[in-house]
């Protein structure tokens, strides 16, 4: 499954939330991998190079904020868009999330009718898919 251009990594330790996000993304035609902590997310991202990483902030072994900071500092992984999906929707949380290395922020509860489109909006063109001469 490496280098699948529609692969999305969902990092969420709440099983029901993880299953819902994966279902919505798969229903929209995406391949999805899931894991439940930031350390696994870093390992999977390095191996699979997903198109987008969707990550909760509060995770067991390593928080989403810590994982995003590590991903943002890694030259081979920093270009992968990272989207925080979290129940933290207080004033200032969005700025804190973006400063930690996330590219976007979606507050929980997610809106099922628009979730997949919100995530796809973070897709960036894959350089190796462009035509010669572009």
Identify the function of each model-found stretch.
Residues 16, 37-40, 63-69:
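Acidic catalytic/metal-coordinating carboxylates
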Residues 19-27:
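Charged docking surfaces used in two-component/phosphorelay signaling
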Residues 60-63, 78, 90, 108-109:
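The feature encodes the CheY-like receiver
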Residues 48-54, 59:
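Active-site beta3 strand of CheY-like receiver
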Residues 43, 65-78:
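Short amphipathic alpha-helix used as the core "switch/output" element in two-component signaling
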Residues 12:
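Conserved acidic carboxylate
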Residues 29-36, 44, 106:
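Short hydrophobic/Thr-rich beta-strand motif most characteristic of the beta2 strand and flanking loop
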């Amino acid at each position: 499954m490496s280098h699948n251009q529609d692969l999305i990594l969902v990092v969420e330790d709440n099983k029901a939330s993880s299953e819902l996000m994966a279902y919505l993304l798969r229903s929209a035609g995406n391949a999805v991998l899931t894991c439940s902590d930031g350390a696994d997310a870093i390992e999977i991202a390095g191996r699979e190079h997903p198109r987008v990483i969707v990550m909760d902030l509060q995770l067991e072994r390593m928080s989403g904020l810590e994982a995003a900071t590590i991903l943002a500092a890694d030259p081979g992984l920093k270009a992968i868009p990272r989207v925080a999906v979290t129940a933290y929707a207080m004033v200032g949380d969005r700025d804190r999330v973006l400063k930690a290395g996330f590219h976007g922020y979606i507050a929980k509860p997610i809106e099922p009718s628009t979730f997949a489109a919100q995530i796809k909006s973070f897709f960036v063109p894959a350089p190796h898919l462009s035509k010669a001469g572009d």
